[in-house]
From Swiss-Prot:
Gene3D superfamilies noted in UniProt: 1.25.40.90, ANTH domain
Keyword Membrane applies: yes
SUPFAM superfamilies cross-referenced by the UniProt entry: ENTH/VHS domain (SSF48464), GAT-like domain (SSF89009)
Biased composition (Acidic residues): 295-305
Keywords for the protein's UniProt record, in alphabetical order: Coated pit, Cytoplasmic vesicle, Endocytosis, Golgi apparatus, Membrane
Region: Disordered, residue numbers: 283-307
Protein's recorded name: Putative clathrin assembly protein At1g14686
Phylogenetic lineage: Eukaryota, Viridiplantae, Streptophyta, Embryophyta, Tracheophyta
Localization in the cell: Membrane, Clathrin-coated pit; Golgi apparatus; Cytoplasmic vesicle, Clathrin-coated vesicle
């Protein structure tokens, strides 16, 4: 059966290899082959070394990968294409930040026959989950959001960036193989990429939370305090989810998940402190709104009195003078305009 599959791979990838007009194009075809049983690591490493030494080659490489992924119905080609793109970030190529939104859409890959019980249904779901993560990650890093995180950034900007990174972690832990038929080397290597990414991003989040919390004090606004509290609550929940995810990966035999990290827990005292800040900010906001409402009511009363006073002291020049001298009416103006 394996021999038949390998023969099919040769038939599918052969024409593309023959048509390849340079060694780099051939490397992309090999790294994204139809082979569901193995992955050509050497070709992928060759591509990464080339990009690191010649950053300008990334754009044509992305076009090659995109062209191959767009027209395939093979989960193996699609997944390997995603892994190859992900590798540009993992190998610390700064030029990878120029990619932005992925130039292909795999959000509905294989949806026509993606039932869980079907032969390739689990693989198609895996591809869609991997794409959702990588597309979101590529967009976030393209915007340079993480790199705007510095001491000069406002507390709100830093909190927003941390929250976006937490969303990236959420998309990572949704990447899971379903079914025993998915326990193969290609999936295992993809999971190693996922675990590596989680370790880097979640570690970054924990360090940044520790940095920004001391800057969350009573003088900041309700928006900042409320967002900080949500981030801390999410971090505590995410720590538990990641522990379960790593246990899952360990059972799968993912090599870099054999030791479950001691995920940082936010001290309960910090959570209580943030909660108090949010409550105080809310009460202050309510008091401010009440004072504003009272001031507006007083202003309306002043306008009404001024209108009445104006009516009292306005002379009607069109009125004819009476025959006899009018009775003198004394208007105590100071009393009318005193408040």
């Amino acid at each position: 059966m394996k021999l038949w599959k390998r023969a099919a791979v040769v038939l599918k990838d052969g024409p593309s290899l023959i048509a390849a007009d340079d060694i780099l194009t051939a490397a992309v075809v090999k790294a994204t082959s139809h082979d569901e049983l193995s992955i050509d690591t050497e070709s992928a490493q060759f591509i990464y070394r080339h990009v690191l030494s010649s950053p300008s080659s990334l754009k044509p490489l992305v076009s090659l990968i995109s062209s191959r992924v767009k027209r395939t119905r093979s989960w193996a080609v699609a997944l390997k294409g995603l892994m190859l793109m992900h590798g540009f970030f993992l190998c610390k190529s700064t030029v990878a930040e120029s990619i932005g939104r992925l130039p292909f859409d795999l959000s509905s890959f294989g949806e026509g026959n993606s039932r869980i019980m079907s032969k390739s249904g689990g693989f198609n779901l895996f591809v869609r989950a991997y794409f959702a993560f990588l597309d979101r990650r590529s967009i976030l890093f393209h915007d340079g959001n993480r790199h705007r995180y510095n001491e000069e950034s406002s507390v709100l900007i830093r909190l927003v960036i941390i929250r976006k990174m937490q969303i990236i972690v959420d998309s990572l832990i949704r990447i899971k193989p379903i079914g025993e038929n998915m326990m193969i080397p290609v999936i295992n290597e993809a999971m190693e990429n996922v675990v590596s990414e989680i370790m880097e991003i979640y570690g970054w989040i924990c360090r940044r939370i520790a940095e920004v919390l001391p800057n969350v004090h009573s003088k900041i606004g309700k928006t900042e305090a409320d967002l900080a509290l949500k981030i801390v609550a999410k971090s505590m929940k995410q720590g538990g989810e990641l522990k379960k995810y790593f246990e899952f990966c360990k059972d799968l035999g993912v090599s870099n998940a054999q030791e479950i990290p001691n995920f940082v827990r936010i001290p309960e005292a910090d959570v209580i402190h943030l909660d108090e800040l949010v409550r105080t900010a809310m009460e202050s906001s309510e008091e401010s709104a009440e004072r504003t409402e009272i001031a507006e009511e007083e202003e309306e009363e002043e306008e009404e009195i001024e209108t009445k006073l104006s009516d009292l002291i306005t002379l009607d020049h069109n009125e004819e003078a009476p025959a006899s001298p009018p009775r003198v009416v004394v208007v105590d103006i100071p009393d009318l305009i005193s408040f």
